[in-house]
Amino acid sequence: MAYNIWEEYIMANFHNVYPVVTNLFLFIALSYSFCIFVFFSFFFVKMRKVIYFFLIICLHSNVGWHPFFVFFCGVSGLYVKELQVGNYYICNLKDYANETCTVNYDYNKMIKLLCPINKSYEEYDDRYCFKFIGIRDRLVINNQEEPIMDTLPGIIIENLNMFDRYNVGIYMPFYVKEDITIVCTCESSKDSEAITPYLKIHVKANNSFNKEGEFIKGCDYGNNKGKHQFLTNTLKQEENFLCEINANPGEVVGMNCINFEEYTTTTTINNKKKKHQNKNNKNNFDVIQLRPPHCFSNVSISMSFLRVVTMNVNNLLPEAKYYPEVYSFPKDKKFQKYSTISYLWIPENVPHDILFYCHCNFPQGKGIGLFNINKTVES
């Protein structure tokens, strides 16, 4: 009887206390949630540059969103001028506008330069990259008489305008004929008295892919010779519509459609040397293009006499590397003269002979680069 009385007493008090306890825990949970919301809002505002910076790395690297969340949770307190991620080197002069970066040449290193967008200056173009001569009056001496393509034939430069900055991609050529140092500059603010912000790249010929000084195997329908040559087969589409390349595992092959000597002419304007497009030459990007789009990321395979299939090269060679990379964002059209240069690094493991092609589209026809990749010979 006593047990029933105590049980009824406890149950009656429990029903009275339960709403109070529930409201107390709910209040505590809401208080903590509000504090966490305020903290992360403040944290995001303070660390937004770092988050955007690493987001660009993920987008450039084509590695998806997972590294972004790992970085955000793990090392989001890191705020750097230079960063090495795998074979990517990033120089952040957007947030370090009065400083410089220095890196050594590596043909397998993809270099990314982040520059601020200064509305008072002209837009970024390849004239901001040139042979390094020296510094005078805290300014980098710009040797505009020598375009970067004369200094390093086969270099690829591109630009994406994202997140209120220039995202300049620099792909160094696999063939380098001599030791040299180049710089790519960013514009500093008008009232800045600091040195011009720049990225310096030290290039050593003995670090190039072909250390014997040989050109890269490939088809150059731009017929670039002399100081502009970087591929083995230089030819004109009017004379040769087919270029055949035999390559082995571990080698690099290339393709190009533009003649760089014809693309630019030098004129004197106000006693200053400037480069401009020669309106009378044949290098019109509306009609001269490398196909399929994003060759060598995509290549063409002939399935039969009348059937051609385009597929990703990694379906044929899973470990192959192609340069430049493929982006879902539109590229700056001022860099289109580099858009017909492409490289493919063949992996060491090639299970069987593979035949594919890319081609240059000209007003008068096509120039086809046919690439025969030999299978790996078992030892």
Swiss-Prot record:
Glycan attachment positions: N98, N118, N206, N298, N374
Keyword line: Cell membrane, Disulfide bond, Glycoprotein, Malaria, Membrane, Repeat, Signal
InterPro entries for this protein: 6_CYS_dom, 6_CYS_dom_sf, Parasite_Repro/Invasion_Surf
Domain (6-Cys): residue spans on this chain: 69-206, 215-379
Signal peptide: 1-33
Keyword Plastid set for record: no
GO cellular component: cell surface; plasma membrane
Free-text disruption phenotype from the record: Attenuated parasites that cannot commit to infection, even when they encounter with hepatocytes, resulting in continuous traversal of hepatocytes.
Free-text function comment from the UniProt entry: Involved in sporozoite infection of hepatocytes and replication therein.
PANTHER family according to UniProt: ANCHORED PROTEIN, PUTATIVE (AFU_ORTHOLOGUE AFUA_4G09600)-RELATED (PTHR38796:SF1), PTHR38796
UniProt protein name: Sporozoite surface protein P36
Organism, scientific name: Plasmodium falciparum (isolate 3D7)
Higher taxonomy: Eukaryota, Sar, Alveolata, Apicomplexa, Aconoidasida
